A protein has these predicted regions:
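Elongated, amphipathic alpha-helical interaction scaffolds
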Residues: 1-141
């Protein structure tokens, strides 16, 4: 359940922008406990020109992804909660691969995108986040 207008707007905006290039689930439950993923995206048929027009969001949507948008700077606790959701989903997928006796690689597992307007250096350092300037622009960790 979305409590704030920004949360609803962010979820609906991401859904509208990503739906032409894949499947978007708003408010997907995580089974370990009742926690909700804001936006779970699975790429569909590629539309390169549309993805390109989305810029950075289009690049992020190149793989299965969890999007967790925040209106204000996220706290360490909120980031840990997002990481917990990612680990739960990855665990579910890995168990499914084992049950089906199929091989998995990191490309089949979702990526986590925590979207915040700002993050302090102390917060970034506390998670040992490092920029990947070869693949992403400044500000992406």
């Amino acid at each position: 359940m979305t409590r704030f207008i920004h949360d609803r707007f962010a979820k609906e905006y991401l859904s509208e922008m990503l739906s032409p290039i894949g499947t978007v689930n708003i408010g997907r439950d995580v089974t370990s406990e009742v926690r909700e993923i804001d936006v779970y995206f699975t790429p569909g048929t590629a539309i390169p020109e549309y993805s390109s027009s989305l810029g950075l969001l289009g690049k992020m949507a190149g793989t299965t992804a969890i999007f967790e948008p925040f209106r204000n700077p996220a706290s360490a606790s909120e980031i840990c909660s997002c990481l917990g959701k990612l680990l739960d989903v990855r665990g579910d997928k890995e168990r499914k691969f084992r049950r089906e006796n199929t091989r998995s690689d990191d490309e089949q597992l979702p990526k986590l995108w925590i979207l915040v307007p700002t993050a302090s250096k102390a917060l970034i350092d506390s998670f040992n986040a490092k920029p990947d300037t070869e693949n992403w622009m400044q500000g992406i960790y």
